[in-house]
Design a protein with these regions (language model features):
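Short hydrophobic alpha-helices at membrane interfaces in multi-pass membrane enzymes
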Residues: 160-181
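Transmembrane alpha-helical segments
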Residues: 97-108, 150-162, 195-203, 271-276, ...
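Short, Lys/Arg-rich, polar N-terminal cytosolic tail immediately upstream
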Residues: 1-6
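Intrinsically disordered, polar/acidic, low-complexity terminal segments
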Residues: 7-68, 82-100, 108-113, 215, ...
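Membrane-interface micro-motifs in multi-pass membrane enzymes
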Residues: 118-159, 264-270, 305-335
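Signature aromatic-anchored transmembrane alpha helix within multi-pass, membrane-resident enzymes
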Residues: 172-174, 288, 341-371
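Alpha-helical transmembrane segments
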Residues: 8-22, 116-123, 222-228, 301
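Transmembrane catalytic cores of multi-pass membrane glycosyltransferases
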Residues: 24-87, 91, 138-141, 173, ...
Length: 548
């Protein structure tokens, strides 16, 4: 490789390094998600304990397959790295992101240069939804990013073998067959997209397939067989049927409609690019009408067909759209190159290099500010908060197995980027039965965890009857200052607040603000506790409440 070639790839390398660094930072600097705390434990074992060997990992996956899901491959990866150490997974995830981007460009039959890289990054950072759920959240990333990357490897080799007559090397054959199996084992909607691609490729190239030699036919059939075996293992899991018993199965356009609306601009730009390409003048070696037809058959039609089975599942989350979005981005990259080549051919006086650089800069200026700000935010606020929480628990309460632990609450919501598509909300709440609090307390082996602002008190009034009435906290003038907590975002269990009157109040307001309770409740009060970061103390009810 000569110096000129190296210089040409320096901008590509810099963009990839910055992007990968951002992905790593946004993952590593945040607290773990509720799923990651929970997946650290052996599933189906009571009393449960953290995974500490391969026997635990095997037992956990066997239990999960029987009771929850067929996604054994992705959950094996998740639980393996939760056992071995998440930092390894953060690094691998950043590299997987670059491989994902590279494969999109590779499948579009274009060079891995700054022009195509800027189009892909623009699409990922601005045109798709739930970026953090797909690429930053580790459990989500292995489910969606890693599985979609496996899909791209498989369809890349399959397309090249069937359509481009490419002869694969021994290493490529191994990758081809392995990716077929891992894609089949990966995740339901990814298998639907891949299966649709394979079926349409088989239909449109069946005559060509019949003319292949025996060795090539066996390679293609073997790959489809491995994909099919993985798919059957995935969907036939008893755990899938157990989940369907809980969630049900009925035809609904609502979730699909919402998911499509969430990527409306990606759909619009892809459609416009196809229309423009369709009407480009034909060249001797290239018919753009034929190219657009191939794009429709190879990418758009699989997109449409694969949506159908998802309309029968109630759990068609927006984060599940990544393989669908990826097909559209491939088409967008392909057509962008055709359109710009046409522009450069027509406008001979246009400086191609300068125009391309200007175009790339515009895309990156639009796409990256929130992403870069979010990366900075993760070092300024998320990492110090993560270290504070973990050190607080580790140093103060790790050996107090039954203690209620009070930790600092995240207090920088006002500084979150207005377009918060890159930062996951993994912040513990005041209510100890919120889902992240519950899983954190299990993970750190303490009785319960509550989060409180540094200048606030938690006031808890325990009662021996069920009561979810909203009681106001009044100031000295009788004005409502705040109200009792009666619900959490995801309380576990949902009834946990019926026997607890809980609210938070600034420390300097405790003496002049009291909660107003009915006289009928006075005889049912069993305990009154005030908590802050220094600990807790029991007080008289008259310190915090008045009765009427």
């Amino acid at each position: 490789m000569n110096i000129q070639t190296i210089k040409k790839y320096i901008p590509v390398a810099l963009i990839c390094i910055i992007f990968a660094f951002g992905i790593f930072s946004l993952s590593a600097n945040n607290l773990m998600s509720p799923d990651e705390y929970n997946y650290s434990f052996v599933v189906g074992l009571e009393p449960t304990h953290k995974i500490s060997n391969f026997s635990d990992l095997f037992f956990s996956q066997r239990s999960m397959y029987a009771t929850w899901t067929g996604r054994i491959l992705v959950h094996t990866v998740i639980q393996l790295f939760l056992w071995l150490g998440l930092p390894i997974l953060y690094v691998l995830n950043s590299l997987m992101m670059i491989l994902f981007v590279f494969l999109i460009i590779k499948i579009s039959k274009n060079k891995f240069n700054t022009f195509n890289l800027s189009i892909v990054l623009f699409s990922l950072l601005t045109l798709i939804q739930c970026f953090a759920d797909k690429f930053i959240w580790m459990a989500g990333s292995v489910n969606y990013l890693w599985s979609t990357t496996s899909m791209l490897v498989y369809i890349y080799y399959l397309y090249n073998v069937v359509v481009e007559y490419k002869k694969l090397s021994p290493i490529e054959i191994i990758l081809f067959l392995l990716s077929a199996l891992t894609t089949g084992l990966s995740q339901e909607n990814i298998t639907f997209v891949t299966g649709s691609f394979v079926i349409l490729l088989a239909i449109t190239n069946f005559k060509k397939f019949l003319k292949f030699d025996f060795k090539k036919k066996m390679l293609i059939v073997s790959s489809v067989f491995l994909f099919g075996c993985g798919f059957l293992f995935l969907i036939s899991a008893p755990g899938n049927f157990a989940r369907l018993d809980n969630t049900g199965m009925s035809f609904s356009l609502e979730q699909a409609k919402n998911n499509l609306f969430g990527i409306k601009y990606l759909i619009l730009l892809t459609t416009i690019s196809m229309i423009f390409t369709f009407f480009l003048p034909c060249k001797k070696t290239r018919s753009f009408k034929k190219i657009v037809l191939e794009e429709f058959l190879n990418f758009i039609l699989p997109f449409i067909i694969a949506l159908v089975p998802m309309m029968f599942l109630k759990e068609f989350y927006a984060r599940s759209m990544l393989p669908y979005e990826t097909l559209l981005i491939i088409v967008l990259v392909k057509n962008s190159n055709y359109i710009f080549d046409f522009i450069f051919d027509k406008l001979k006086n246009l400086n191609k290099a300068h125009f391309s650089i200007a175009f790339e800069c515009i895309l990156l200026i639009i796409a990256t500010p929130y992403f870069l700000y979010s990366t900075w935010f993760s070092y300024k606020y998320l990492l110090p908060y993560k270290q504070e929480v973990e050190n607080y628990i580790a140093h103060s309460f790790m050996h107090a197995k039954t203690e209620n632990v009070i930790i600092p609450k995240f207090e920088h919501f006002d500084k979150l980027p207005s377009k918060n598509n890159y930062i996951l909300h993994h912040y513990p709440e005041t209510i100890s039965t919120g889902i992240i609090n519950s899983y954190m307390s299990k993970y750190f082996e303490v009785g319960s965890i509550q989060a409180i602002e540094k200048d606030y008190y938690i006031v808890e009034i325990s009662i021996d009857i069920d009561d979810l009435n909203v009681y106001p906290v009044l100031d000295q003038d009788g004005n409502v200052y705040r109200e009792r907590f009666t619900s959490a975002a995801q309380p576990m269990p949902a009834t946990s607040l019926k026997n607890l009157i809980l609210y938070t109040i600034p420390k300097d307001c405790l003496e002049r603000c009291k909660i107003e309770l009915p006289n009928s409740l006075k005889s049912h009060i069993t305990d009154v506790v005030i908590k802050d970061l220094s600990g807790s103390k029991t007080v008289n009810i008259n310190t915090v409440a008045t009765f009427k």
